[in-house]
């Protein structure tokens, strides 16, 4: 029999950790935070409801729980996402980035037995892509990427040998913008029937905000990914295209691969997209500026910031910093954590053996972090390295430098 006293302890822990989280600084590039407005649907009855009537057919209300707010999905979410991506066709039903990946492969990869080309994981591609292709019945081929550029000779050979149905560009670990236009040109030259899809999960917010190029403008047929990394949305996924035929292929795959699309999260995505149309451009530009400034400050202070020969550290929200061996990195990470600053340690970043801090300034920026906050954050990194100011107040000192957030505060 359940002991209610134990449940009370669990609830107390949740509440305590929620207070702690609210005071923390998160520097994880694959995470972000919902605005108060976008968070609202997750605590409503719509979290419990199905919604299938995408066309708002008055004779198709088989599930009526979402009827009163249906247009938040069909018009607000789809409409704002469409305008942000400049893509008339949007599928907002994927429940995650991997969910969107499955739908894209199943819908665009052709009959089983064909080849799906993706980015080598050692070059920054997603760890699951090649295996996902094989599990869906496709052959998998990978290509290396260096500083955002696909190896053209290698890629051309893959196109000629495999004549793939789908090229799935899935760069997740990168300090550089993915160059899509040259890939599209090579496909047109060597395998013109091949579909080019760009998984921009990590850079979605930077693309929709205009800080990075839109892959659809560069020749991609489709794009998509998760909506909770540089884009400040819920844990969901989305797919975009300008082709009605490809939209139908994606929709057909989605229909048989996904039932519940998590209605409340989709409403949250709609509200996040509406806010992003107001704040997104300024936010995206500030994210890149903050990442570059943090890299410059840390490098000037003696930190081993990964950069190109010309000193260029990043074009995205990601910044990579080496602290030392595993023990040194863990000690540094724990010091920051004890001071309310959470960092992400990775051991398989392209060209960087051993543990590395993979930092993201997307959430800090969304919550109001501008130049002053980045300067304060760099000071806390110095404190962690030098072992000074062990007062647990690091995140508070950074937050004191926040400016206005990139969302509507009236809904807080």
From Swiss-Prot:
Family: Belongs to the SHMT family.
Pfam families per UniProt: SHMT
Native source species: Streptomyces sp
Gene3D superfamilies in the record: Aspartate Aminotransferase, domain 1 (3.90.1150.10), Type I PLP-dependent aspartate aminotransferase-like (Major domain) (3.40.640.10)
Entry EC number(s): 2.2.1.-
Cellular component terms (Gene Ontology): cytoplasm
Top-level taxonomic group: Bacteria
Pathway: Antibiotic biosynthesis
Enzyme class (EC, first level): transferase
GO MF term set: glycine hydroxymethyltransferase activity; pyridoxal phosphate binding
Protein name: L-threonine:uridine-5'-aldehyde transaldolase
Chain's gene name: capH
Ribosomal protein recorded as keyword: no
N6-(pyridoxal phosphate)lysine: residues carrying this PTM: 229
GO terms for biological process, alphabetical: antibiotic biosynthetic process; glycine biosynthetic process from serine; tetrahydrofolate metabolic process
Reactions catalysed according to its record: uridine-5'-aldehyde + L-threonine = (5'S,6'S)-C-glycyluridine + acetaldehyde
């Amino acid at each position: 029999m359940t002991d209610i006293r134990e449940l009370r302890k669990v609830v107390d822990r949740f509440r305590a950790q929620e207070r702690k989280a609210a005071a923390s600084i998160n520097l994880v590039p694959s995470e972000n935070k919902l605005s108060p407005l976008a968070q609202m649907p997750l605590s409503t009855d719509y979290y419990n409801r199905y919604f299938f009537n995408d066309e708002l057919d008055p004779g198709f209300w088989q599930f009526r729980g979402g009827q009163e707010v249906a247009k938040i999905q069909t018009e607000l979410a789809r409409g704002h996402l469409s305008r942000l991506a400049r893509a008339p066709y949007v599928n907002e039903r994927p429940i995650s980035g991997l969910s969107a990946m499955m739908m894209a492969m199943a819908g665009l990869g052709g009959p089983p037995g064909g080849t799906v080309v993706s980015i080598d994981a050692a070059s920054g591609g997603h760890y699951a892509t090649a295996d996902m292709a094989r599990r869906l019945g496709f052959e998998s081929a990978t290509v290396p990427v260096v500083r955002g550029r696909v190896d053209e000779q290698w890629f051309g050979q893959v196109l000629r040998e495999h004549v793939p149905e789908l090229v799935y560009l899935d760069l997740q670990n990168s300090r550089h913008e993915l160059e899509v236009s040259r890939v599209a040109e090579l496909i047109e030259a060597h395998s013109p029937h091949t579909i080019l899809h760009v998984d921009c999960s990590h850079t979605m917010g930077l693309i929709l905000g205009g800080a990075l190029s839109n892959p659809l403008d560069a020749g991609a047929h489709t794009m998509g990914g998760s909506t909770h990394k540089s884009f400040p949305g819920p844990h969901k996924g989305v797919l975009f295209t300008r082709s009605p035929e490809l939209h139908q292929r994606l929709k057909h795959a989605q229909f048989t691969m996904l039932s519940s699309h998590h209605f409340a999260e989709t409403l949250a995505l709609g509200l996040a997209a509406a806010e992003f149309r107001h704040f997104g451009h300024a936010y995206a530009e500030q994210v890149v500026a903050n990442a570059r400034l943090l890299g410059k400050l840390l490098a000037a202070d003696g930190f081993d910031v990964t950069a190109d020969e010309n000193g260029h550290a990043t074009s995205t929200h990601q910044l990579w910093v080496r602290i030392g061996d595993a023990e040194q990195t863990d000690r540094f990470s724990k010091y920051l954590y004890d001071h309310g600053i959470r960092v992400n340690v990775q051991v398989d970043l392209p060209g960087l053996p051993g543990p590395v801090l993979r930092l993201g300034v997307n959430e800090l920026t969304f919550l109001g972090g501008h130049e002053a906050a980045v300067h304060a954050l760099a000071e806390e990194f110095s404190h962690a390295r030098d072992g000074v100011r062990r007062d647990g107040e690091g995140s508070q000192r950074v937050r004191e430098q926040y400016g206005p957030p990139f969302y509507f505060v009236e809904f807080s």
